C-alpha cells in the first residue's frame, strides 16, 4: 500500500471514529452569511488552537451554524492528522453514566483523552443532575491543557447555572474551559 493510500485510509478511519452525525466541511460553511468575522474563521480553520491545546466555545441560538462549524472544524482537524471525537452533551453524559454503572468511567475518560479534539455539541440543551455535572467535570479537568475541547451551546456562560445545578463544580468546569478559550458568539 502506498503512503497516499494509507493516509486516505487513516482519514476514513478517523472520520468513522469521530462519530459525526452528518458530514460537514468548512468549505460548505457560508462565512459571509454568518456573524463570524473572516479573520476569526481563518484562525479557527488554521487549527492552531488545536495544536496549542486550547478550547473553543461557540455560543448562539438555534440555526446559526454552531454544529456545522464544529463538525467542519473537526473534519478539517482529521484531514490535518488529528484524532477527533464528537458527542452531543446528552450522548456524552449517557456514555459516562453507563461507565459509572459498570465501573468503566475512568477507562472511558482515558480513551477520550487519547484524541486531540473533543467536540461537545448542544451543551445545555437539557439540564444535568449533580452526578452528570461531576462526570462532565472529570472529562474537562482531564483535558485541561492536554487536549482541546470545542463546545457548542445556546447559553452564554453566565447562564450555565440553568443546566449545571451544582455551582462549585460548574465554576470549576468554567474555570478550566475559559483559561485557554476562543469564544465565538454566533
Feature locations, PLM:
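Conserved small/polar residues in nucleotide/adenosyl-binding loops
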Residues: 1-5, 184-186
Amino acid at each position: 500500500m502506498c503512503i497516499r493510500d494509507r493516509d486516505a485510509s487513516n482519514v476514513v478511519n478517523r472520520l468513522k471514529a469521530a462519530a459525526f452525525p452528518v458530514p460537514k466541511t468548512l468549505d460548505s460553511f457560508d462565512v459571509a452569511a454568518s456573524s463570524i468575522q473572516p479573520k476569526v474563521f481563518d484562525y479557527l480553520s488554521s487549527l492552531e488552537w488545536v495544536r496549542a491545546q486550547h478550547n473553543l466555545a461557540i455560543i448562539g441560538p438555534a440555526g446559526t451554524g454552531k454544529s456545522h462549524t464544529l463538525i467542519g472544524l473537526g473534519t478539517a482537524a482529521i484531514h490535518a492528522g488529528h484524532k477527533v471525537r464528537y458527542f452531543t452533551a446528552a450522548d456524552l453524559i449517557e456514555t459516562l453514566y453507563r461507565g459509572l454503572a459498570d465501573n468503566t468511567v475512568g477507562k472511558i475518560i482515558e480513551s477520550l483523552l487519547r484524541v486531540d479534539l473533543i467536540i461537545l455539541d448542544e451543551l445545555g440543551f437539557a439540564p444535568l443532575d449533580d452526578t452528570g455535572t461531576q462526570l462532565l467535570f472529570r472529562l474537562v479537568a482531564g483535558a485541561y491543557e492536554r487536549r482541546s475541547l470545542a463546545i457548542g451551546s445556546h447559553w452564554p456562560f453566565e447562564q450555565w447555572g440553568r443546566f449545571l445545578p451544582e455551582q462549585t463544580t460548574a465554576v470549576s468546569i468554567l474555570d478550566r474551559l475559559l483559561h485557554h478559550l476562543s469564544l465565538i458568539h454566533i
